[in-house]
């Protein structure tokens, strides 16, 4: 990323102050043969072709010293960087050829001498003149400019010290540390832009381990495009804040592991063969390598926009429950923007004084639902009166409370605005929500997450923005007579070890209807799923998707019907399912980047057979888990395993559901 200290905003302003660059315009192959950007038409956008001089903006570097203005090149749009890397710099090169291709690109567009730049590091800024360029090394040969201009955080950094430093570096500096001084003639526009692309690439795209990756297909498709998209998704607030933190932590861990791995490999090359120390180092090296591969796989899942939604991330909720009030009293909170006498009379009759003794119950009035939720203790009730309420924070519900609408859901609308995280965060032991319409805007996380405890949603409407409802491990979720739509990810995500009961709901117009996370790992419990009389329709992908690792696909093909595990898992249903589609990780990645389309499965009686298909696939997956556990116990010397331990009931029932007009069918499997 271009240094924010020089711009005051860095690339964070990219979406707000776009700058067009010369090579964003598509060039014909013939023009490339003449030399990239060597003629006026190829180095400036059509909006600048009739204007003399530079087509770029300039800005003054911050600091105590008055430096000359430099080119402002860090506010480029996604497609401008995309086209530059794809068409002109990297093309179809392999990871091992990146520096070579970059050097060839720079030879075509970079002025070899005659320009000035600000050499910028974390410690100082100094003005230099470029006398030559070592393209192969991506370095410039420089000398101090006259007059001498330097801005340093260290007062003792004198001109003599700077000369000594340059001598140590043989007057050769990395191009990415140079910021070209502005020249309104336009002669150095290409130079400034080319250096910006090199700088951005090595700061945001390149990883130190990339060269050691397999070169089966071009580096741009495999690494550059997904990382570039993720960078701009983060800039434009399309990625949850927690996931961004996870990504940067994974990067740091991977870099640290790779550094240790390189040091270990270097020490091994200097060891005597067959020594005890070498054997120990080799074991440690294998461990580091395995650790790195796992970290890199996690990074790839986050970098890919489709898999980012499919796998998500485990957000830890640190909400603390308040418990019961010290007085032991329970309070009813009434939410209304304005309280009319007639409304108050109806409330007293219908809700507040239904039982004897409720006349003594305390009532608090609020103008917005968020303040009411925040004021709740264990056992409180929140009654939301008809109206349209706009909130900007998260409903963090850690105590067992009831949140209910007084009227029809369409008359009681709670709308969340602002680029925050989750709309409703549930960690309470027994939370009940009913009769409310939740509307989400500009979100980067799901509309409702059940982290733990039990949450019941009844007679509600959920208008989603990103993912819909997420049911985490060990959580219980019950949804009845509700409508969920609009999720860009899955409408409902079900994690291993959770319980999910869905009855008489509509789930539609989402990316996927319901997504069941991988539960085949030995550390995971089988989820308990009940789906009765739901209508799952008009989703872009599948009605229901099961995510599981590729390594278990062979087991499924060889699984035998009628095993004890199958018998324990059977429910009241019949019918033979079609074979579920399987999509491996690479196909998913290609699909997400638009390189291929997943094949749609034809199922003429989809809404009838969909229930059977889901049941049979889940039974087969659960059977695999039982077989794997038996094998592991056998390896430990336990020859007679208790079948009851391995035949947990996955679901109470999957019956009466209708699957209509889902883009890829009623059921699919993601293999990763």
UniProtKB/Swiss-Prot annotation:
- Any idea where this protein resides? Midbody; Cytoplasm, Cytoskeleton, Spindle
Cytoplasm among keywords: yes
Q: Which Gene3D superfamilies match?
A: Single-stranded right-handed beta-helix, Pectin lyase-like
- Name the UniProt key words of this record, in alphabetical order: Acetylation, Cytoplasm, Cytoskeleton, Phosphoprotein, Repeat
Q: Report which superkingdom the organism of origin falls in.
A: Eukaryota
Q: Does the keyword Transferase apply?
A: no
- Pfam families per record: Beta_helix, SHCBP_N
The chain residues annotated with the modification Phosphoserine are: 5, 31, 42, 44, 47, 273, 634
Q: Which GO terms describe its cellular component?
A: cytoplasm; midbody; spindle
Where do the PbH1 repeat units fall? 428-451, 452-473, 474-496, 497-518, 526-548
Q: What biological-process terms (Gene Ontology) are attached? A: fibroblast growth factor receptor signaling pathway; regulation of neural precursor cell proliferation
Role played: May play a role in signaling pathways governing cellular proliferation, cell growth and differentiation. May be a component of a novel signaling pathway downstream of Shc. Acts as a positive regulator of FGF signaling in neural progenitor cells.
How it assembles, according to the record, is:
Interacts directly with isoform p52shc of SHC1 via its SH2 domain. Interacts with TRIM71; leading to enhanced SHCBP1 protein stability. Interacts with both members of the centralspindlin complex, KIF23 and RACGAP1.
Q: What is this protein called?
A: SHC SH2 domain-binding protein 1
Q: Which gene encodes it?
A: SHCBP1
